[in-house]
Amino acid sequence: HKPVLEQEEAVGHAVRAGYMYSGMADVAAITGDSSYIKAIDKIWENIVGKKIYITGGIGARHAGEAFGDNYELPNLTAYNETCAAIGNVYMNYRLFLLHGDSKYFDVLERTLYNGLISGVSLDGGKFFYPNPLSCDGKYHFNADHTITRQPWFGCACCPSNISRFIPSLPGYVLSLIHISE
C-alpha cells in the first residue's frame, strides 16, 4: 500500500487503520508537519463521507475485517467491529485536539453512543465482535454462526478493548484545548 503521507482513502483492516490514523494525528499535532495534517484530513473526509455507517461503525467487510470500497455499506452483512469503533473514537478525539473543530466530536459521540456501546450487553457480560445494522434471523454474522452477543470469543480483543476503553470515558466527557490564533 501507499506510504501514510500519500494515502487519501481508508483501506485495509479497520481496527489497525483507526489506530494508525490516530498515530498520524498525533504526529501532526506534535510536529506541526502540514503533510501529516493534509493526509489525515483527506483520510478522515473519505471515512465520514463514504465509509462510515449511520451508527459511526467502520469496516464494512468480514473478509479482512476491512474497510470496503467507497459507499460499500451493507446493513445485513456489515462488519463494524467493536474494536474499529474504539479506533474511530480515538482518531476523532485526536483530530479534535489537533484542529479544535467540534465536527470530530460529533463523529466521536455518534460512534460512542451507537457503534461502540452496542458491542456490550447491558449487564456487561456478553459482547458483539461484529455489529451489523440489521438481522434477519438467518444470516449468522458471528464467527461461531450465531446471531447473539457472546460471553467470550476465541479472539477476545473486543471484550478486553471495551474494558480498557470504558475507564477512559471521563477524559472524553470534557475536553479543553487552547488554540492560539
Give, region by region, the residue ranges found by the protein language model:
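Glycan-recognition and catalytic cores of secretory/periplasmic carbohydrate-active enzymes
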Residues: H1-E181
